Amino acid sequence: MKALRRFTVRAHLPERLAALDQLSTNLRWSWDKPTQDLFAAIDPALWEQCGHDPVALLGAVNPARLDELALDAEFLGALDELAADLNDYLSRPLWYQEQQDAGVAAQALPTGIAYFSLEFGVAEVLPNYSGGLGILAGDHLKSASDLGVPLIAVGLYYRSGYFRQSLTADGWQHETYPSLDPQGLPLRLLTDANGDPVLVEVALGDNAVLRARIWVAQVGRVPLLLLDSDIPENEHDLRNVTDRLYGGDQEHRIKQEILAGIGGVRAIRAYTAVEKLTPPEVFHMNEGHAGFLGIERIRELVTDAGLDFDTALTVVRSSTVFTTHTPVPAGIDRFPLEMVQRYVNDQRGDGRSRLLPGLPADRIVALGAEDDPAKFNMAHMGLRLAQRANGVSLLHGRVSRAMFNELWAGFDPDEVPIGSVTNGVHAPTWAAPQWLQLGRELAGSDSLREPVVWQRLHQVDPAHLWWIRSQLRSMLVEDVRARLRQSWLERGATDAELGWIATAFDPNVLTVGFARRVPTYKRLTLMLRDPDRLEQLLLDEQRPIQLIVAGKSHPADDGGKALIQQVVRFADRPQVRHRIAFLPNYDMSMARLLYWGCDVWLNNPLRPLEACGTSGMKSALNGGLNLSIRDGWWDEWYDGENGWEIPSADGVADENRRDDLEAGALYDLLAQAVAPKFYERDERGVPQRWVEMVRHTLQTLGPKVLASRMVRDYVEHYYAPAAQSFRRTAGAQFDAARELADYRRRAEEAWPKIEIADVDSTGLPDTPLLGSQLTLTATVRLAGLRPNDVTVQGVLGRVDAGDVLMDPVTVEMAHTGTGDGGYEIFSTTTPLPLAGPVGYTVRVLPRHPMLAASNELGLVTLA
């Protein structure tokens, strides 16, 4: 029979072992191997049985064993040392504090940052993630902690976590949802001074109120607040709001996003009050999922500070960072406008919102407007609420500027104010212990964040590098065999049928990994375009390869499940099953061994649909060589020596033909470039040319792919400027915010009437030469704005056959006087910067010292 409800009972720890509680509930243990080794020493078999979960271990260990350890001097010495190390880690000055101590930087750095995401992949024991976004968010928190960045993270606590994947006998994905007991996880309940749970409330339509308690996961120095709606104070249907990650219909999803955004801000206010912390100055939203956080902050300023909507919006924009993680419109949450209006509007009919008291409902709805008037676009709302925005690789930044160009109509895509911060990965989480040990030996007292440390790899004997790679491949093969056996048994096989698994896969064979989510654009089955060719590669007598595949399809995506089934059916074939496997239930623990042990990491998305693709970074961090389409981060950092580029048939419109061409290129690379280099050995059995690629990969990519680099980029280029803007707008009783809001109102009112009446050019000789002086004069009607309210620019560049300016250069034009009828005169003289067919135009843009850029408001008038 099944239990109605599950809960966890923990054993009492002897007083001398009390430090185990702190070590087990701070998730820093998940990236600190000495702490993991300490827990393993309590009961090695139970540690494995509990899935390397310290909280579960302490709940299951025999009390007699704890009493024994309380008298074990060696164990107690290690415990005291690790407890002291954790306390030192939590309190000592780190990179962020060193920047503050530098003086000038202290004036720019925010006192706190709030980081919002719908998923967080911090550790296997807290399965609050589904894919790359969650793992990235987890790495962001861990690296922020390692750097001392004062971050508070906010998300939802999912009672079922993400699903467990298994396979049916015919290879079809089957999902089961674990029931997670928060009391059995490294979480603590946020309580007030009386010990009562702190609840946040959000008013929904029909007089319903959604309430949530707040679980706190301590990720090193960073608290992660997880909102949980499964409490008795909620009506039955509202208790299920946080049941599953990305589960349910759109009604369910919008409730989750309302709770994450509005409830998340209220959770931060409650947490900082209870812990007596300074409220965060900067708010970072990942995707539009938590977009409602910006509107809640507007409500706070309207209600508590007495600001009008526009002034409050100005303050919120100044201190908000928006990161887009998708390169396609289909990845954006778009709700029916009627649905959003139902949640936002108040039934009293006074135009004010019940969800966000004091705010006009029409202003809220307008923030999510897009070209389809029946839709509310969460990404558009996020961008309108943020003064700073970015994609997650250089290429993705370009793709995002084009995708959101409509919000800045009149600007070329390259001018859309969306930058980029290329993602990174958390080395202590993803690098194998062997590489971390080598890194410590090479670094000495220096930091692994410094590129010079990675250059010291030239000192290491190639045979030692190859020994590490071979050791990690052997570990992977053992893990693959165990997982393969378990999967076949779950699918109905018997032990008598599985003798072949003992010799499946070979620790000496070139090992290729492909593991990721299974949306169509990632092309899981590209490798199967020519099954006979793939079989030849797998079974080559001289240079065989072996292929390990893993990934989950969304439960509602039968197309993705069909792709998985194709791979499984091919891998089930007796002649190849010892060389290719699909491993079900891809998660962090499986991924880690894949990154460690695979020689080659395969990535073949449809370009440019991969926003970043951090799995390849994790492989590179372990000396794996990438074999990838030039997409995401690989487009940016591939240099010809750190892996291989799969040629992309970008101009081919026929998808089938494109797949055939790119699959053929993949097979050719494996057969003619990758395998020969791997199997070419010297007299010591070392593949010298391969190892030099491994060394080069570590030296050049190692410092770049670190999440510590990524977080520092965010601090320096986004968080610090946002904090400065916030202080300017919020200081002096919000006077600067009022001034900027007033300017924006005046500019938006005047802009449709602004006119460039005339443009005159003089000074050029009959045959213009490069460097010849061109004088431009523009006559402009400003419709009530002052000359210093605008920037007038001359724009010069090469022109194509349709007179479209290519790679334009802008030159600011000075105000030189007032003409007849109140028209203002602007002019400039500039040398011609280019040879060949050249053209020019003139445009007018807003100008205000509080704007991050002149294109921020999306206003422009062209001649």
Curated annotation (Swiss-Prot):
* Modified-residue entries (N6-(pyridoxal phosphate)lysine), positions: 618
Keywords, comma-separated and alphabetical: Allosteric enzyme, Carbohydrate metabolism, Glycogen metabolism, Glycosyltransferase, Pyridoxal phosphate, Transferase
Substrates-to-products reaction catalysed: [(1->4)-alpha-D-glucosyl](n) + phosphate = [(1->4)-alpha-D-glucosyl](n-1) + alpha-D-glucose 1-phosphate
SUPFAM superfamilies given in the database record: UDP-Glycosyltransferase/glycogen phosphorylase
Organism domain of life: Bacteria
UniProt xrefs under Pfam families: DUF3417, Phosphorylase
> What processes does the entry annotate via GO biological process terms?
glycogen metabolic process
Gene Ontology molecular functions:
glycogen phosphorylase activity; pyridoxal phosphate binding
Q: Which cofactor names does the annotation list? A: pyridoxal 5'-phosphate
Its function?
Phosphorylase is an important allosteric enzyme in carbohydrate metabolism. Enzymes from different sources differ in their regulatory mechanisms and in their natural substrates. However, all known phosphorylases share catalytic and structural properties.
Q: Which family does it belong to?
A: Belongs to the glycogen phosphorylase family.
What else does the entry mention about this protein? Was identified as a high-confidence drug target.
Q: What is this protein called?
A: Glycogen phosphorylase
Q: Which organism is it from?
A: Mycobacterium tuberculosis (strain ATCC 25618 / H37Rv)
Species classification: Bacteria, Bacillati, Actinomycetota, Actinomycetes, Mycobacteriales
Q: Which gene encodes it?
A: glgP
